[in-house]
Amino acid sequence: MQRAGATTPSTSPIAQVRTPAPLARNNIVTYLATQFDSLDVRGISDVDSLVLACVSYYQLPDVATAARTPEGMPIVDLYRADWFEGLTLGLWDPEGLVRLLGSIVASPRFRTIRLCDYVSETDFGSEQQFSACTLRLPTGDVYVSFRGTANSIVGWKEDFNMAFETRVPSQSRAVRYLERAASFAEGRVYVGGHSKGGNLAAYAAAMCDQATHARIAAAFSHDGPGFTRETLSSPSWKESAGLIHKTVPRSSLIGMLFEQQEDFSTVESTSVGVLQHDPFSWIVDGVEFRRADGLSGGADFLDR
């Protein structure tokens, strides 16, 4: 983990071309500011999942030792001005992520969450970059959040390895992490992620052991890359297909990578092209994403 104040040039293709997305009139931040139902009244939706998937992007400091245990720490304890720079250093939208954290800790739906079992690992030898956390919800359920692609050569190289290998190191690690998280959970298990994190969430939900699989209520992939033909034709995947909910923006490029795709729904975005990968650009109407009729021409071409 990098210390606050360190500077590392971003190697992410998206980060290099990114300009701040036009703020959606209604996005996940305004959703948190306007929707106050408890999770007992209205359960986890794909909009909620995108919020919780983004939590795994925060890079916790070494002093946050409680967050690395099964008991965890209150998520409100993350909201410290002296931590903001380190939490978001090198990420795609530091200001947006700080704003999101403030909205989470103010939200009646999520402000009592505990952040548990945070891990962040990089292995240059196996070309693995992996980070995840478990969010203990006020209902007694948990949401396992897998981080998306980090702005590093290792992170992007592993993403491209997914196009050619049926099981890359971070996918194997995600399965083990999910099984451990489920063993500590009292209630149902939700799992999700954005970008590569969505791929890891779907893969782990499909390939975990039967005891864990029986606990999973839903798995969410938010513009996560797809899978090889071998993975999608496996018995484990076919058994799990009904649990997996994939959302992609209309001009999705990242989520349409790889030879075949699982089923998905399409959402509207305020950005264009590859910038639609930014979750803050996804439009929310009320408590749901604004659905699009289908993919744009470029994204549809990638899906063929």
Name the predicted role of every residue range.
Residues 201-210:
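Short glycine-enriched nucleophile-adjacent loop
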